[in-house]
């Protein structure tokens, strides 16, 4: 019982340090992604801090603008919930949280990711931007709806698409997440890390940097799962070629269109932290190097390796069109099949 207060203090301290470093680092990732993407397309690209850090700072200083929504308070609160969800998603993969009520497990990760997906459905159902409100006079142009029929808002289509993506688009990522846990024959993150990096679990020196001896990434099921995880990573970030939720050609920005000024800054924080959290989770589960605030070398290694997925994302986005559901459904089914194959192989390892 004497160790409980010390554990709680350590949990609070590690959470504050990890959250602060994670949020600040996440504001750099979009700039690196955009810079790599620009270089691939033979452009100079923006300064590294502009898409993340300076954009958040700029929108944070703008005058508050109330969004047009069916329930404005609920719509505003969704972005706050989003920040809390993605920060907890990241914290649950840090070592101190592995012993808290089983949250450092596949269930904690999958549950929070699913909550994050639900937010986009709610955003699309609530937002009613002036760009898609009903006209003050009847629209009698050829092909328009008849007078008296209720017009739909553009964002509602974004909500419907988010629901479809939540049902099948994100399935490959969850199957890929299962593979490291299946190989460790446990649902806990600690067991997955111990299987790959036993030296880290046994180490008590805060300056040590035990490297993994058998990373999941270097096995056949691990390679297959990593490929599936990366595509699922792109899907959850709503980036090309899976950015149909916010396709400029018909939905403009989708359900987040009405987020302006400070709300837009919060939305950027939410998205950027999600990008970093998913990258850090990949490094923890597939390589065996967790983000440990009390082991600086391990923390720096995790941060450095977390650049892999954003750089790969930049290369993909640089050449990708926007897919429709006619292409997304077969892609998701095919990737899910690869994920199932990796899972079956991992159970026999």
Per-region residue spans from a language model:
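Transmembrane alpha-helix boundary signature
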Residues: 87-101, 121-133
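Juxtamembrane inter-helical linkers in multi-pass membrane proteins
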Residues: 35-60, 132-158, 239-263
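Juxtamembrane boundary at the C-terminal end of a transmembrane helix
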Residues: 342-349
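Juxtamembrane/interfacial segments at transmembrane-helix boundaries in multi-pass membrane proteins
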Residues: 3-7, 83, 97-103, 107-108, ...
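Alpha-helical transmembrane segments
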Residues: 10-26, 101-115, 211-236, 295-298, ...
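Alpha-helical multi-pass transmembrane bundles of energy-transducing inner-membrane proteins
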Residues: 123-210
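Membrane-water interface at loop-to-transmembrane-helix junctions
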Residues: 206-224, 251-275, 282, 297
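Interfacial loop-to-transmembrane junctions
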Residues: 312-339
